[in-house]
A protein has these predicted regions:
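Residue-level signature of outer-membrane beta-barrel architecture
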Residues: 46-48, 81-85, 124, 138, ...
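Short loop/turn motifs that connect adjacent beta-strands in outer-membrane beta-barrel proteins
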Residues: 20-24, 50-59, 84-92, 129
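Mid-chain, well-packed structural core segment of small domains
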Residues: 90-121
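Membrane-embedded beta-strands of outer-membrane beta-barrel proteins
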Residues: 28, 42-46, 77-79, 120, ...
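Solvent-exposed loop/turn segments connecting transmembrane beta-strands
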Residues: 32-42, 65-76, 86, 113, ...
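Cleavable N-terminal export/targeting peptides
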Residues: 1-24
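Transmembrane beta-strand segments that form the barrel wall of outer-membrane beta-barrel proteins
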Residues: 25-34, 56-69, 94-100, 134-140
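Outer-membrane beta-barrel "beta-signal"
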Residues: 38-44, 149-162
Length: 162
């Protein structure tokens, strides 16, 4: 958990150099997580049209569905923020989504069903409709349970704006 403040600080710093971008999006991510070396995770997200702007970042509601090769499922809803970096095609993204984690085995017990997913990433827009990003996410119960191992994932994310 000591790395979370560092990640949030880096995200805040990146936001200071970025400019807003907007559109509703569907995001599909594929990556790996730290339960073992050969585990894979697939994320599916929907981000609404921006509901507000905060420090130049477009903030949207987000719905998240994540499944992995250990038969774990996370379903959550929260907020997502995306900000263009200057006039370039590059952007930074971040999100926070509380939700429900359904473990597929005792090996992936995270302490309780209520979990929180945080995500930070950097990406590039290729046109008005498609972009690709690399993101790191963390799933944890935030210390609400005595047992709180958390899990990290790295995903390559394809975004489709409409």
């Amino acid at each position: 958990m000591k790395t979370l403040p560092s990640i949030l600080s880096a995200f805040a710093l990146l936001l200071t150099f970025a400019q807003p971008a907007s559109a509703a999006e569907v995001v599909v991510g594929l990556g790996t997580f730290d339960f073992d070396d050969d585990g894979a995770v697939v994320d599916l997200e929907y981000h609404t049209d921006p509901i507000t702007s905060f420090r130049g970042a477009d903030v949207s509601f987000a719905v998240v569905l994540s499944a992995d090769t250990k038969s774990d499922i996370f379903i959550g809803a929260g907020v997502s923020a995306v900000r263009q970096i200057g006039d370039s095609p590059w952007f930074v993204e971040g999100s926070f989504a509380p939700g429900f984690f359904f473990e597929g085995s005792e090996e992936t017990d995270l302490g309780q069903t209520l979990e929180f997913r945080t995500l930070i990433g950097v990406g590039r827009r290729f046109d008005n409709n498609y972009s690709l990003s690399l993101a790191a996410s963390h799933l944890s119960n935030g210390g609400l349970s005595d047992f709180n191992p958390g899990v990290n994932a790295i995903t390559l994310r394809l975004r489709r704006s409409f």
